Amino acid sequence: MATNTHNSLDDIFGSSPPHEHEHEHHQHQDLHPQPPPTQAPEPSDLPSLRRQHVTAGYRDGISAAKGAQVQRGFDAGFPVGAQLGMRAGTVLGILEGLVRGYEGRGGVKKPAQLQRGKTASSATEGQGEGDAEAAERKARREEILRLYTRAVKELDVRAVFSGVDGAFATEGDEEEKPEILLRQKGDGVVSRWEERVRVAHWEENMDALEPRDKEEEEEKALSEQS
């Protein structure tokens, strides 16, 4: 049997020599190489699932980091704000008390005004002194009211801590931590008002009045019991 005879199984096992048109096709591919096959397209659900997981991970990361940072910021900033807030409140309370005191306080009556049967000249003189005191008291009240209005504006939390945004350094720098910068900035503003209002003088007077108030309360309680 000749070797070049066609075998019925050549189409299956490929033992027959290549056909002429197949040889020409391979030569054409060698002369013009084909680009590598592209990656198979992903199923349509994968991009959507990937975006969902990226978004969920991003939100979880923000929530975890936010909780840690907020708690740390609260622990460091709350004592500073509470201390400065109490000092600023003391300044405003003193000024507000003075304004109300001058507003509701009547003129001081002289003994001559309380006596009957005084001459017309004495009554006129006493009335003139009362008018002068009322005018002086009114001017003093207006002066304190202007000072109080200015203090309310300058002791506002945004005004006290203005100018420190973005000036925070790294956590390792002890001298430039945010709470230290806030304390320094706020202390300078509040201290100037404490000196202007003489807070120390008022606190001494309040400390002196506290024992009297306690004694009066005790006496009142004893009288009610009896």
Curated annotation (Swiss-Prot):
Q: What segment(s) does the record annotate as region Disordered?
A: 1-53, 105-136
Q: Which segments show compositional bias classed as Basic and acidic residues?
A: 18-31
Question: What InterPro entries does the record tag this protein with?
Answer: Essential_protein_Yae1_N, Yae1-like
Which superkingdom heads the taxonomic lineage of this protein's source?
Eukaryota
Q: Which GO terms describe its biological process?
A: protein maturation
Instruction: Give the residue ranges for region: deca-GX3 motif.
Output: 57-97
User: Where is the protein localized?
Assistant: Cytoplasm; Nucleus
What are the GO cellular component annotations? cytoplasm; nucleus
Where mainly found? cytoplasm
| Entry keywords, A to Z | Cytoplasm, Nucleus
**One Pfam family, short name please?**
Yae1_N
Self-association state and partner proteins as the record states: May form a complex with LTO1.
As for family, the record states: Belongs to the YAE1 family.
Q: What does this protein do?
A: The complex LTO1:YAE1 may function as a target specific adapter that probably recruits apo-RPLI1 to the cytosolic iron-sulfur protein assembly (CIA) complex machinery. May be required for biogenesis of the large ribosomal subunit and initiation of translation.
Q: Supply the name of the protein.
A: Protein yae1
Q: Which source organism?
A: Aspergillus clavatus (strain ATCC 1007 / CBS 513.65 / DSM 816 / NCTC 3887 / NRRL 1 / QM 1276 / 107)
